[in-house]
Structures are given as C-alpha cells and as structure tokens.
Amino acid sequence: MLQPKKTKFRRSQKGRMKGNAQRGNRLSFGSFGIKTLQAKWITGQQIEAARIAVTRCMQRQGQVWVRIFPDKPITKKPAEVRMGKGKGSPEGFVVPVTPGRILFEVEGVVFDVAKEALRLAAQKLPVTTKFIVRHDYDFNILK
C-alpha cells in the first residue's frame, strides 16, 4: 500500500479542491498517459490496482510512471459512535486530484497496447479520465 514513511502531522483538514491542476498537467516522461477530468480523492489501493492492471496488460514491456502519491492522511471514527469527542483515528492516505492532473504515463509500447492498458487502469480509478498522447509522437514508430 502506498503511504508516506513519515508525516509531520497525524491528521489533516479536509480542504477544498477547486480549479484545474496547475502542476503535473503535462506529459513529462512517457508518450502516452491518462489525465483526470474530475476532482476527487484517490486512495493508495486504487493507485496500486491501476498500476498492476497496466503492467499486466503491457506484459511487463515498456515502462510505467505513476505521477501521483497519496500523502494526505484520512481519519475515520468507529461504527456506531456519537458525534463529537474529537477527530477520528487515521484510516489511510489519499491524493486529492483536480481536473487536468496526469495520473499515469507509459512508454515503450505501441499505441494500441498503451491505449488498452490505460483504459484498464482508468476502470480501477474513481475519476473519469482521458487518454492523451505526446504532441510530437510519431505513429509510424514501433509498428
């Protein structure tokens, strides 16, 4: 499970996600990627499930970059507990993503394989995504 080794504070405020992604919104490593079209929290388990789906579909060829990391602690109160009496105990970690944020990047496979692999990854995630291709990608390569 993805989580930070050490955090400065055990609990954090919920915060608000407004606007589009200002950072992490361009392909930096691979030729293909998926970017979000919604604002949502993504957990470490969801990221790991999507990563496994991509690597299995690509049959361990090429390279995959995960561009997000869950570093926001989430708390939860036990079942059937009355309101109040303080904030709940830490439950796990999430990453808040806003529209335009690149989640995964892929390199070293043909277009069709990359598109299918990232489609499978998108099904594991709670956000709607869009498949994107690097602007200078040559479609005649690797055929």
Swiss-Prot record:
SUPFAM superfamilies: Ribosomal protein L16p/L10e (SSF54686)
Region (Disordered): 1-25
GO cellular component: a single term: cytosolic large ribosomal subunit
Iron-sulfur listed as a keyword: no
Record PROSITE patterns: RIBOSOMAL_L16_2 (PS00701)
Compositionally biased tracts (Basic residues): 1-17
One Gene Ontology biological process: translation
InterPro entries linked to this entry: Ribosomal_uL16, Ribosomal_uL16_bact-type, Ribosomal_uL16_CS, Ribosomal_uL16_dom, Ribosomal_uL16_sf
Keywords carried by this UniProt record: Ribonucleoprotein, Ribosomal protein, RNA-binding, rRNA-binding, tRNA-binding
Function: Binds 23S rRNA and is also seen to make contacts with the A and possibly P site tRNAs.
Subunit architecture: Part of the 50S ribosomal subunit.
Name of the protein in its database record: Large ribosomal subunit protein uL16
Classification lineage: Bacteria, Pseudomonadati, Bacteroidota, Bacteroidia, Bacteroidales
Recorded name of the encoding gene: rplP
